[in-house]
């Protein structure tokens, strides 16, 4: 009697399962691409903005404010918007963070700079700008002929930190503050 060896059946492959797996992977990939475009800002993200900064990676709508960087022959360490009516300014700068640095480190460093020369810096108020946690505080500058009020806001996204500062004379500060908040509401990362 001869025993015939029969090879065990291998796993069967279903065309339906393969299609489902490939479709699932394609959907996941599309989700990653969509999230990346949203996170980085896709084409046209700054179409409604009046100010766009490739250097510091943002765009905002700031009607009535002029970007002074385009009018100066020297490179400023910040972007500066000016309101011609009263010379109020918004200064915007960004820095690369060291590994492990976060919002608390940026807040401490910025407040240390602001409080030099005996300037009294107000309490930190937590808020959000463009969907990321931010911190703000106010202080007054008495040097010069006109007392100046300053609102400073810092926030972190990824490995970069932004410092945005409104400076206006005390009499017009509240008016400019409303415009400043409008500008911040339009903040878009590029």
Residue spans for each PLM region:
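N-terminal targeting sequences that direct proteins away from the cytosol to non-cytosolic compartments
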Residues: 1-85, 143-146, 168-190
């Amino acid at each position: 009697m001869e025993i015939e060896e029969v090879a065990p059946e291998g796993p069967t492959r279903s065309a339906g399962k393969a299609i489902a797996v490939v479709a699932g992977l394609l959907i996941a990939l599309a989700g990653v691409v969509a999230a990346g475009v949203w996170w980085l800002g896709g084409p046209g993200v700054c179409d409604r903005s009046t100010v766009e900064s490739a250097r510091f990676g943002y765009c905002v709508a700031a009607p009535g404010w002029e970007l002074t960087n385009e009018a100066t022959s020297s490179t400023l360490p910040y972007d500066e918007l000016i309101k011609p009516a009263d010379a109020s300014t918004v200064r915007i700068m960004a820095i690369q963070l060291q590994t492990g640095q976060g919002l608390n480190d940026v807040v401490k460093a910025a407040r240390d700079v602001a409080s030099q020369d005996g300037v009294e810096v107000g309490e930190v108020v937590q808020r959000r700008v463009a969907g990321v946690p931010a911190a703000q505080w106010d202080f007054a500058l008495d040097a010069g002929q006109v007392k100046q009020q300053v609102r400073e806001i810092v926030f972190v996204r990824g490995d970069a930190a932004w410092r945005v500062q409104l400076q206006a004379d005390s009499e017009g500060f509240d008016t400019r503050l409303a415009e400043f908040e409008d500008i911040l509401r339009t903040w878009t990362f590029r």
